[in-house]
Amino acid sequence: MSIQKQIMNDLHVKPSIDPKQEIEDRVNFLKQYLKKTGAKGFVLGISGGQDSTLAGRLAQLAAESIREEGGNAEFIAVRLPHGTQQDEDDAQMALKFIKPDKSWTFDIKSAVSAFTDQYKKDTGDQLSDFNKGNVKARMRMIAQYAIGGQEGLLVIGTDHAAEAVTGFFTKYGDGGADLLPLTGLTKRQGRRLLEELGAPERLYLKLPTADLLDEKPQQTDETELGITYNDIDDYLEGKDVSSEVIEALEKRYLSTEHKRQVPASMFDDWWK
């Protein structure tokens, strides 16, 4: 089996999908997992990007379906800006589309600043912009888990196949969650689900950005990765791509394996 086929299998990618069926299956997964755990609902940070918009709407549909069946469940959408967010209008548009049961805002800027100031005071070193960006991602997850713990909710993650294959997420930041309803989807497949759900085009056609760097605000994922999502999706869906794309993706996949595993122990062999 080729590495490409192995990656497709490992990440549960289908070359083609039925958007309606995928929506139904993923909503059912959220419902079943929630019932199994006995939690009271879900919480997710909403950025205004494609992934959190899709995961948020699926979570809301799951909560509503559980209530229609006589159960109790709620979805809390959380805005987690670092000060003023340049694309705040998109975040508000996403919330309007998702229609969450509750919407809260938790500005992480003061918490991040307190940490970076203390880091410099105690180490004598200024935290790099890259590592500060990871602190932002982890602070957002701290906030979501605090809300989840306080309210009895499960934290939803937005990782999907195009992020998983590149390792393009912060370990124990946006990579930390209780359940992942977008697993196996390529970026373009996620767009198809949002289109099926009736989301505004602006939310799934905008260029994806993690927006974690102060020095490069709104830098796109594709700029940071050096690979387009079209190429990533083509690879994951088993289509022909250039040798340069194959080499770049497979190199990233192998080098970021630690992000897709639980912490290594002497009894594991995936890292050897």
Swiss-Prot record:
Pfam families: NAD_synthase (PF02540)
Binding site for deamido-NAD(+): R138, K171, D178, H258, K259
Keywords from the UniProt entry: ATP-binding, Ligase, Magnesium, Metal-binding, NAD, Nucleotide-binding
Catalytic activity from the UniProt record: deamido-NAD(+) + NH4(+) + ATP = AMP + diphosphate + NAD(+) + H(+)
EC number(s) recorded for this UniProt protein: 6.3.1.5
Protein's UniProt keywords contain Protein biosynthesis: no
InterPro entries (UniProt xref): NAD/GMP_synthase, NAD_synthase, NH(3)-dep_NAD(+)_synth, Rossmann-like_a/b/a_fold
Residues holding ATP: G45, I46, S47, G48, G49, Q50, D51, S52, T158, K187, T209
Gene3D superfamilies found in the cross-reference section: HUPs
Cellular compartments per GO CC: cytoplasm
Gene Ontology molecular function, alphabetical: ATP binding; glutaminase activity; metal ion binding; NAD+ synthase (glutamine-hydrolyzing) activity; NAD+ synthase activity
One biological process term in Gene Ontology: NAD biosynthetic process
Function: Catalyzes the ATP-dependent amidation of deamido-NAD to form NAD. Uses ammonia as a nitrogen source.
Family note: Belongs to the NAD synthetase family.
Complexes and interactors: Homodimer.
Official protein name in the record: NH(3)-dependent NAD(+) synthetase
Organism: Bacillus velezensis (strain DSM 23117 / BGSC 10A6 / LMG 26770 / FZB42)
Gene: nadE
